Amino acid sequence: VGPGGECGGRFGGCAGGQCCSRFGFCGSGPKYCAH
């Protein structure tokens, strides 16, 4: 995970069971997980 919460590519996955949104940020909920 990057310093701004980025995920995917070189940043890798998210901690704590969070999802990576299609925009490349970690979070939870449908807007992060449903893509």
Swiss-Prot record:
- The cysteines covalently paired via disulfide bonds are 7-20, 14-26, 19-33
Keywords, alphabetical: Antimicrobial, Chitin-binding, Disulfide bond, Fungicide, Plant defense
> In which tissues or organs does this protein occur?
Expressed in leaf, flower, stem and seed with highest expression in leaf (at protein level).
Give the superkingdom in one word.
Answer: Eukaryota
Q: Which residues form the Chitin-binding type-1 domain?
A: 4-35
Q: Name one GO molecular function term.
A: chitin binding
Keyword Disulfide bond among record annotations: yes
Q: Which GO terms describe its biological process?
A: defense response to fungus; killing of cells of another organism
Starting at the broadest rank, the lineage of the source organism is: Eukaryota, Viridiplantae, Streptophyta, Embryophyta, Tracheophyta
From the record, give the transmembrane residue ranges.
Answer: none
Q: Which SUPFAM superfamilies match?
A: Plant lectins/antimicrobial peptides
Q: What does this protein do?
A: Has antifungal activity against A.niger (IC(50)=5.4 uM), B.sorokiniana (IC(50)=2.0 uM), B.cinerea (IC(50)=1.6 uM), F.solani (IC(50)=3.7 uM) and A.alternata (IC(50)=5.0 uM). Binds chitin in vitro. Has no antibacterial activity at concentrations up to 10 uM.
Q: What is this protein called?
A: Antimicrobial peptide 3
Q: How is it modified after translation?
A: Contains 3 disulfide bonds.
Task: Give the residues annotated as coiled coil.
Answer: none
